[in-house]
Amino acid sequence: MGIKGLTKLLADNAPSCMKEQKFESYFGRKIAVDASMSIYQFLIVVGRTGTEMLTNEAGEVTSHLQGMFNRTIRLLEAGIKPVYVFDGKPPELKRQELAKRYSKRADATADLTGAIEAGNKEDIEKYSKRTVKVTKQHNDDCKRLLRLMGVPVVEATSEAEAQCAALCKSGKVYGVASEDMDSLTFGAPKFLRHLMDPSSRKIPVMEFEVAKILEELQLTMDQFIDLCILSGCDYCDSIRGIGGQTALKLIRQHGSIETILENLNKERYQIPEEWPYNEARKLFKEPDVITDEEQLDIKWTSPDEEGIVQFLVNENGFNIDRVTKAIEKIKTAKNKSSQGRLESFFKPVANSSVPAKRKEIPESTTKGAANKKTKGAGGRKKK
């Protein structure tokens, strides 16, 4: 879920914190990518029609591999250096949110069965996407593929968004690419939405800068975290009737959740009986992340050509000619990106960003939309 309504809240109250950037403007940049979010997108979009999905000869789904392979090559060809960060064990506080998601998938599965029996193609398409879940096997497959491609992988101890933010705060990467707005709540200095969208969608990258958020909202980082908790996050329920705009007003007026609770009209607003906002706050401020330099050995290496062919072609039925051409693209891209950003050697490049247009910013583009098929390296349909 991320932070409920945060995109609109920022568009209305802190518009200068958001800038549309060209995909190509990140040439030479190291970017931490929320891997699970990307894999979820691939499973929903790549080669999928209704309940049909790309599979190998054994009937195992390969949409995530095709999506990860093609999208990563696109990043590399643009001179971008991705670092994929995978989720570890979720915090205990997230159990309730995960239970809600499980329940929604179960409901969607029942609805999908009804849609199939009725032959309603539109509902089949809709409900089949709601049943998608990223599994350990999907993650393991993508980790193996990325390592074969010479792209660094970080396995977070807990939340991937928190680890991405930590990499950004420590200067190891330029920004964080995800669709979950709680990357900002974890304090990522620069947060990028739509970087992992397919080029066919032609949507500019939306770059958020946390320093400008705080400046425009006139909040401290602690107050911004409280604002996000009040708006609605993955770690605890929100107070019914308090949305983002009301939460901002209350934080500006009272400064913290504790003071808000002391002054809140209890007849108008019902506070949850067990509301672990303080624990949620601690998770945002002091997340469980890897800081050991040895565990964060982030290096981009040459692709293992034989390994890629073995994994994609021999084990997963991808087309050998397409995979071979893709490997050449990786090698060419690696040489290109080794040049580094031009401004490191010459004068700074002019900023190509343009002001954000609020009407073009959907609150959630990930878990729904893109219905276009993506042509890729291989696979076959599975019903």
From Swiss-Prot:
Q: What is its main location?
A: nucleus
Kindly give the SUPFAM superfamilies that the UniProt entry links to this protein.
5' to 3' exonuclease, C-terminal subdomain, PIN domain-like
Instruction: Tell me the residue numbers annotated for binding Mg(2+) 1.
Output: 34, 87, 159, 161
Location of region: Interaction with PCNA: 338-346
Note accompanying the cofactor annotation: Binds 2 magnesium ions per subunit. They probably participate in the reaction catalyzed by the enzyme. May bind an additional third magnesium ion after substrate binding.
Q: Where is this region: N-domain?
A: 1-105
The cofactor required is: Mg(2+)
Compositional bias per record (Basic residues), positions renumbered to this chain:
370-383
GO CC, sorted alphabetically, is: mitochondrion; nucleolus; nucleoplasm
Post-translational modification here is noted as: Phosphorylated. Phosphorylation upon DNA damage induces relocalization to the nuclear plasma.
Give the residue ranges for region: Disordered.
337-383
PROSITE patterns for the chain:
XPG_1 (PS00841)
Q: Where is this region: I-domain?
A: 123-254
Q: Which residues bind Mg(2+) 2?
A: 180, 182, 234
Q: Which GO terms describe its biological process?
A: base-excision repair; DNA replication, removal of RNA primer
The protein's UniProt keywords, in alphabetical order, are: DNA damage, DNA repair, DNA replication, Endonuclease, Exonuclease, Hydrolase, Magnesium, Metal-binding, Mitochondrion, Nuclease, Nucleus, Phosphoprotein
Which CDD domains does UniProt cross-reference here?
Answer: H3TH_FEN1-Euk, PIN_FEN1
Instruction: Tell me yes or no: is Oxidoreductase among this UniProt entry's keywords.
Output: no
Q: What is its EC number?
A: 3.1.-.-
How would you classify this enzyme at the top EC level?
hydrolase
What does this chain do?
A: Structure-specific nuclease with 5'-flap endonuclease and 5'-3' exonuclease activities involved in DNA replication and repair. During DNA replication, cleaves the 5'-overhanging flap structure that is generated by displacement synthesis when DNA polymerase encounters the 5'-end of a downstream Okazaki fragment. It enters the flap from the 5'-end and then tracks to cleave the flap base, leaving a nick for ligation. Also involved in the long patch base excision repair (LP-BER) pathway, by cleaving within the apurinic/apyrimidinic (AP) site-terminated flap.
Q: Which PANTHER family match?
A: FLAP ENDONUCLEASE 1, FLAP ENDONUCLEASE FAMILY MEMBER
Task: List the HAMAP family hit by this protein, alphabetically.
Answer: Fen
Q: Which family does it belong to?
A: Belongs to the XPG/RAD2 endonuclease family. FEN1 subfamily.
Quaternary structure, per UniProt, is: Interacts with PCNA. Three molecules of FEN1 bind to one PCNA trimer with each molecule binding to one PCNA monomer. PCNA stimulates the nuclease activity without altering cleavage specificity.
Name of the protein: Flap endonuclease 1
Q: In which organism is this protein found?
A: Arabidopsis thaliana
Taxonomy of the source species: Eukaryota, Viridiplantae, Streptophyta, Embryophyta, Tracheophyta
**GN (gene name):** FEN1
